[in-house]
């Protein structure tokens, strides 16, 4: 489950038995790292990942594959749904997106190794039960891998990089073996800089012929799409965790490296990079070459080509291998991840906390709702005057749990 192949990894341990996973129903997801989270703007969907075993001590194990957790970004409430159908195996390091409320899931690492299987789930049928569907795509797929990135553009999912097995077929791009993976595995792995396209209308794989100087192979990097540009920042390659910034023109397939002005974030892997406007990206957390977890946040201004450090109240809450999703209200919702060095042999500090970053001004409706809640005792007798949908939001918020807001 590491961003390369170092120390003891949970992926090398026996698969868990899930029948005694939780004796009590949880009001929120279990703590985890290496999960996926995607958003439709109002809801965040969380699946997969792994956590520490409370019984067997140092052992980590994958979380139940049937569980999909849905977080209401307006009310701060969680809901668990047990999915059915072609349910993916329990995994970490998968790659996921949400397009028109359809969840797409590719790759990852499970108890038997890496995979290159592709799944989809239509969240619009949540009231009738959610069904996973495994898609047998046409064309030559990417190699089996995890810790890769993805951009969404028009009807295409564009995947980049990752850590996994040598491709079985001839592909465009570079693959570099991780020499340490030969020591403890019969299936050595490595990093790559491959770009693969999946057309969501035909479900056919293809590879573009890119121009320009491509980034080095890497894994545990972060990708974000703004317009026709696919940005990638950082990630791990061999012993280095990098802080380089590139974008791929998703119309012309030309790579460009960006050299920002002024101070830049330190090199890192296992961080998040989230589009928050047509001109800004939001960076949070990660893990340095010196194996230090990070709690810093930055905004990158595309038009000015500069990084600006973002002040926030979570400086004592470092996170790595977490997830981050943007809401329609100008917030970035960070969930889960690890607060310490998960590569060492003592227990990893996995989290199930929600951190909320306000990166855009709040709407008047949002400010009004927060005022109503803040002065609830004074205004409670007037709640009946609220429109039904606003009254519902107010009532829901009083049941919120496990959130922190800026």
From Swiss-Prot:
<dbReference type="InterPro" id="IPR011043">
    <property type="entry name" value="Gal_Oxase/kelch_b-propeller"/>
</dbReference>
<feature type="repeat" description="Kelch 5">
    <location>
        <begin position="271"/>
        <end position="311"/>
    </location>
</feature>
<dbReference type="GO" id="GO:0043161">
    <property type="term" value="P:proteasome-mediated ubiquitin-dependent protein catabolic process"/>
</dbReference>
<dbReference type="GO" id="GO:1990756">
    <property type="term" value="F:ubiquitin-like ligase-substrate adaptor activity"/>
</dbReference>
<dbReference type="GO" id="GO:0005634">
    <property type="term" value="C:nucleus"/>
</dbReference>
<feature type="repeat" description="Kelch 4">
    <location>
        <begin position="221"/>
        <end position="259"/>
    </location>
</feature>
<comment type="function">
    <text>Substrate-recognition component of a Cul2-RING (CRL2) E3 ubiquitin-protein ligase complex of the DesCEND (destruction via C-end degrons) pathway, which recognizes a C-degron located at the extreme C terminus of target proteins, leading to their ubiquitination and degradation. The C-degron recognized by the DesCEND pathway is usually a motif of less than ten residues and can be present in full-length proteins, truncated proteins or proteolytically cleaved forms.</text>
</comment>
<keyword id="KW-0880">Kelch repeat</keyword>
<feature type="repeat" description="Kelch 6">
    <location>
        <begin position="322"/>
        <end position="359"/>
    </location>
</feature>
<comment type="subunit">
    <text>Component of a CRL2(KLHDC2) E3 ubiquitin-protein ligase complex, also named ECS(KLHDC2) complex, composed of CUL2, Elongin BC (ELOB and ELOC), RBX1 and substrate-specific adapter KLHDC2. May form oligomers as a KLHDC2-ELOB-ELOC complex; this interaction is autoinhibitory for the E3 ligase complex as the substrate-binding site of KLHDC2 is blocked in the oligomer. Interacts with CREB3; interaction is direct and specific as it does not interact with CREB1, ATF4, ATF6, JUN, FOS, CEBPA or herpes simplex virus transactivator VP16.</text>
</comment>
<dbReference type="GO" id="GO:0140627">
    <property type="term" value="P:ubiquitin-dependent protein catabolic process via the C-end degron rule pathway"/>
</dbReference>
<keyword id="KW-0677">Repeat</keyword>
<feature type="repeat" description="Kelch 1">
    <location>
        <begin position="31"/>
        <end position="85"/>
    </location>
</feature>
<feature type="repeat" description="Kelch 2">
    <location>
        <begin position="92"/>
        <end position="136"/>
    </location>
</feature>
<feature type="repeat" description="Kelch 3">
    <location>
        <begin position="148"/>
        <end position="207"/>
    </location>
</feature>
<dbReference type="GO" id="GO:0016604">
    <property type="term" value="C:nuclear body"/>
</dbReference>
<comment type="pathway">
    <text>Protein modification; protein ubiquitination.</text>
</comment>
<keyword id="KW-0539">Nucleus</keyword>
<dbReference type="InterPro" id="IPR015915">
    <property type="entry name" value="Kelch-typ_b-propeller"/>
</dbReference>
<keyword id="KW-0832">Ubl conjugation</keyword>
<dbReference type="GO" id="GO:0031965">
    <property type="term" value="C:nuclear membrane"/>
</dbReference>
<dbReference type="GO" id="GO:0016567">
    <property type="term" value="P:protein ubiquitination"/>
</dbReference>
<protein>
    <recommendedName>
        <fullName>Kelch domain-containing protein 2</fullName>
    </recommendedName>
</protein>
<dbReference type="GO" id="GO:0031462">
    <property type="term" value="C:Cul2-RING ubiquitin ligase complex"/>
</dbReference>
<dbReference type="Pfam" id="PF24681">
    <property type="entry name" value="Kelch_KLHDC2_KLHL20_DRC7"/>
</dbReference>
<keyword id="KW-0833">Ubl conjugation pathway</keyword>
